[in-house]
Amino acid sequence: DGYTRISESDMLLQPDPSTFQILPWRGDQGQSSRMFCDVLTPDGRPAPADPRHVLRRVLDRAADRGFTCFTHPEIEFYLLQSDQPGPDGEPVPVDRAGYFDNVPGSDAADFRRDAVSLLEGMGISVEFSHHENGPGQNEIDLRAADALTTADNVMTFRTVVKEVAAAQGTYATFMPKPFSEHPGSGMHTHISLFEGDSNAFYDPADEFRLSVTGRRFIAGLLRHSVEISAVTHQFVNSYKRLWGGGEAPSYVSWGHNNRSALVRVPLYLSLIHISE
C-alpha cells in the first residue's frame, strides 16, 4: 500500500541476499530467517517509491560527489504491562522509573540487557541503552553505520524489541505520544558526512566549526522540513509529541544545546555532525 496507484498495484519483491539473517528467537518452534527485499515494477525496474531504492539513489548521488553518509539513531519506546488499557483507560507502564534509572533486576533493566544481547548477536552494534524520562520509557542507541545499513537495522530493531517484550510478558510501543502527561518517543538521528577520511561538516576556522557543506546541509533540512515531516510524521499522534517540551523539536531552526530546534550541531570539535 502507498507505493503506486490502484491500477499499478502489481509489484515484485527481489530479496537482497546481503541482508540474510537467521532469527534467533522462538528457537523451540524451528528456525526461521529473513531478508529485506527491493520492490520492483513488473518489468523489473526499481519501484520509484521503494524506500530502500530512494535512499540508495540519494547515497549514490552523494558518492558521485565524493561523500559517504553515516547515521546513528537514538530509538525511544515505552514498555507497557500489556497492549490493553488499564482501569482508567490509559496504557499501564511497567515501572515508574525516571531518566537514567538503573535499578538492578527491574523489568526495564532486564529488558534492555536482553534486547541489547539479541541485537549484538545479530550483528547490530549497540552504543548505549538507558531508561528515559517517562515511566516505562527506554532508549537504545545503535552505533553509526552507513545510512542504508542503519535503515535496515532500525527495521530489525523494532522487531527485536517487540519480540523481547513479548517473551517477557510485556508490550513495547513506538507510538510517538502514548501519554499526554509524559514525554513522547522519537528517534533522534545523528548524521555525519565524510569526504574520504575527512569530516565534511567540520571547518576549524569557522565560528561554529561548520564548513560551507555543513551549513548548506542544514539549510536543505530546514528548507524541506515540511516535506520531510510528511514522511517522518505520518500520524496525528506524531504531532502531539512536537509541542509541550519533552526535548521534542518545536521550531524549524538550528542550534546547539536547544532541544526545541529541529536541527542541532553538537560542539564536539572535529566530531561535529548534524543531529535531527
Question: Which role fits each region the language model picked out?
Answer:
Residues D1-L271, S275:
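Glycine-rich, acidic/polar active-site loops that bind/position phosphate-bearing ligands
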